[in-house]
């Protein structure tokens, strides 16, 4: 049984193919954090399917692409995969060769051609992405992806197991394993050899000498002068050359192993509220900017005897932490960083995590 997971769960882009005789080989591309649940939604076994797939069912999942660090990065990949002609990045690739002219995927063969083109060219070739084949339709791209060092795994929907992650910054969840009394130990024994600051286990580590670096220091070390994304570089300790995406994969494995040793309810750190390990991201959330308060502000409306509004005094939605404090001395609340793809505000995320695969 193969388990696909990551420190914050699975962020994947999948491809479906229709089994209907009316439109054979018709494909659909989408995003999910749980392929097992998503295919049931598309086949109308449970609620939550897509409008475009309600007519041409039943569907089967051919493959999905995992390894994205955040939900936003996976959604961007899904959009480029669905509409390659609208992306300036894909147009630059297509302009170099007549064979790489891409069109919007309507059939499964076109969708696979676009997928291979995206995964074997930067910037996606520099990310720790992988492909999981779930149907025989996707076997023809296996050799092409493996030639360009893209990990390919073959599985079935029955053997597939998805483990949810934790919606929290990695330095809070994975700072250190919790002690017996439930408190989190934030004392770091490792020191970054570049900046000489303490580093937590959520940072990258050399695969040869096990030296641990700050993720920002290592990123600068692995970034070339003519690139913006870290590619490869040498460890300043053992002088061995590594690829940046390989170090991210190892980091993800360590974070997943550390997550399993953390209790299901994470203790609050630095004012953060406790977070459940079983929480997961929805397949699609409404893209909207939310305020720090979910309740709208209410107005204190005073009316005269005839019912005409005499005055309107807005009532602040910010509650006082101490009833003895007067409203005149109330300080404004510290704003939260709002993720437009989430249904509620959350604190700023620390360096992104990547997906890990364990057998």
Curated annotation (Swiss-Prot):
Which InterPro entries does the record match to this protein?
A: GIY-YIG_endonuc, GIY-YIG_endonuc_sf, Slx1, SLX1_endonuclease, Znf_RING, Znf_RING/FYVE/PHD
Renumbered to this chain, region (Disordered) spans 256-359
The answer to whether the entry has keyword Nucleus is yes
Reply yes or no: does the keyword Transferase apply. no
Q: What class of enzyme is it?
A: hydrolase
Q: Quick one: where is this thing mainly located? A: nucleus
Ranges of compositional bias, category Low complexity: 316-326
Q: Where is the GIY-YIG domain?
A: 9-91
ZnF SLX1-type residues are 192-238
Subcellular compartments = Nucleus
Q: Name one Pfam family in it.
A: GIY-YIG
For this protein, what is the EC number?
A: 3.1.-.-
One BP term from GO = DNA recombination
Enumerate composition-biased segments (Basic and acidic residues).
Answer: 295-306
Role of this protein: Catalytic subunit of a heterodimeric structure-specific endonuclease that resolves DNA secondary structures generated during DNA repair and recombination. Has endonuclease activity towards branched DNA substrates, introducing single-strand cuts in duplex DNA close to junctions with ss-DNA.
Record-given protein name: Structure-specific endonuclease subunit SLX1 homolog
Q: Give the originating organism.
A: Giardia intestinalis (strain ATCC 50803 / WB clone C6)
């Amino acid at each position: 049984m193969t388990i696909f997971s990551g420190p914050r769960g699975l962020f994947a882009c999948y491809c479906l193919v229709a089994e209907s005789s009316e439109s054979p080989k018709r494909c659909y591309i989408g995003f999910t954090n749980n392929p097992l649940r998503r295919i049931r939604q598309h086949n109308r076994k449970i609620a939550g399917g897509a409008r475009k797939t309600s007519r041409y069912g039943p569907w089967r999942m051919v493959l999905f692409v995992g390894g994205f660090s955040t939900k936003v990065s996976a959604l961007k990949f899904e959009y480029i995969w669905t509409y390659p002609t609208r992306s300036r990045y894909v147009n630059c690739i297509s302009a170099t060769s007549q064979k790489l002219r891409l069109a919007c995927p309507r059939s499964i063969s076109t969708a696979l051609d676009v997928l291979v083109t995206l995964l074997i060219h930067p910037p996606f070739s520099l990310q720790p992405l992988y492909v999981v084949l779930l149907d025989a339709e996707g076997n023809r791209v296996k050799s092409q992806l493996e030639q360009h060092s893209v990990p390919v795994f073959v599985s079935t929907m029955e053997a597939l197991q998805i483990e949810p992650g934790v919606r929290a910054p990695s330095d809070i969840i994975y700072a250190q394993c919790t002690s017996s009394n439930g408190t989190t130990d934030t004392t770091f024994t490792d020191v970054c050899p570049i900046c000489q600051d303490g580093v937590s286990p959520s940072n990258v580590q050399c695969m040869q000498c096990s030296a641990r670096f700050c993720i920002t220091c290592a990123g600068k070390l692995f970034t070339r002068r003519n690139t913006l994304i870290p590619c490869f570089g040498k460890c300043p300790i053992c002088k061995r050359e590594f690829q940046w995406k390989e170090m991210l994969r190892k980091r993800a494995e360590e974070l997943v192993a550390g997550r399993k040793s953390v209790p299901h309810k994470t203790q609050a750190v630095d004012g953060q509220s406790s977070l459940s390990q079983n929480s997961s991201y929805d397949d699609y959330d409404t893209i909207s900017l939310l305020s720090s308060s979910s309740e709208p502000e209410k107005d204190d409306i005073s009316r005269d005897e005839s019912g005409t509004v005499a005055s309107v005094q807005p009532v602040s939605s910010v509650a006082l932490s101490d009833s003895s404090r007067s409203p005149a001395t109330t300080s404004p609340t510290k704003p939260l960083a709002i993720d437009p793809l989430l249904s509620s505000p959350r604190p700023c995320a620390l360096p992104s995590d990547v997906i890990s695969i364990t057998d």
